[in-house]
């Protein structure tokens, strides 16, 4: 089940650079559901009491702010400072998105978890694989992943992290998450096989490379408009 879930969660990322606010995570989960085998779908349905992956796709953003899951606050990102290579990034002891995805994947693969804990681990995985593929979640510590890089989005003051987390999906189309999933879930079979064989570290490296391009194209005070999103 783990392999199928990870594969499905990467399909959207391989198709387009997508923002990861609530809708982005919903789209990711919707695409995952489209590619589950019957056996995996049945298993997940049992774990989630019939609720969909989409229902739980944003759960971790809220859970990380509760005392029970406060330890997961740093799991949503991995900071790579300007001038550093990916391998030089400081890996904090509290954990980061790459370590979390790797450890959760290993835990699910090993099996033997009580159903309730297995469901929690799966909810986390659904969300964190999405976070790992948003450029600003591999951003710089000095500006908190773009949160302190002030820009204007179609004239509205905001920050670079919010642009990529939330604004970009809505700029192109006012689609529902299900329509987004339908439109972007179009990888050819050869690409699907390549992504299926991928590993979390490779995904994180790809996101960091894209993040560098985003920073270069979005200096402090940048006016982000039609030429940026076209």
Show which residues each predicted segment covers.
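N-terminal, motif-rich segments that launch catalysis or mediate targeting to/interaction with membranes
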Residues: 18-128, 135, 140-230
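Sec-dependent signal peptide recognition
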Residues: 2-8
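Residue-level micro-sites within transmembrane alpha helices that shape
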Residues: 2, 130-133
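N-terminal signal peptide c-region/cleavage motif recognized by signal peptidases
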Residues: 14-16
């Amino acid at each position: 089940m783990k392999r199928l879930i990870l594969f499905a969660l990467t399909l959207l990322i391989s198709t387009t650079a997508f923002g990861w606010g609530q809708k982005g995570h919903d789209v990711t989960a919707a695409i995952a559901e489209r590619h589950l085998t019957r056996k995996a779908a049945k298993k997940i349905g049992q774990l989630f009491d019939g609720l969909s992956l989409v229902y739980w796709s944003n759960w971790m953003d809220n859970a990380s702010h509760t005392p029970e899951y406060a330890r997961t606050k740093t799991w949503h990102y991995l900071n790579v400072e300007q001038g550093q290579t990916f391998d030089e990034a400081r890996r904090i002891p509290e954990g980061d998105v790459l370590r979390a995805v790797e450890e959760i994947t290993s835990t699910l693969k090993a099996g033997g978890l009580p159903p309730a804990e297995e469901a929690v681990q799966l909810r986390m995985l659904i969300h964190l694989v999405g976070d790992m593929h948003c450029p600003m979640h591999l951003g710089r510590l000095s500006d908190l992943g773009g949160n302190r890089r002030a820009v204007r989005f179609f004239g509205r003051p905001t920050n670079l992290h919010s642009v990529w987390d939330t604004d970009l999906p809505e700029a192109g189309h006012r689609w529902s998450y299900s329509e987004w999933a339908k439109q972007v879930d179009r990888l050819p079979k050869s690409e699907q096989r390549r992504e299926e064989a991928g590993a979390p570290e490779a995904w994180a490296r790809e996101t960091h490379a894209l993040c560098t391009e985003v920073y270069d194209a979005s200096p402090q005070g940048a006016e982000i408009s039609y030429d940026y999103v076209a």
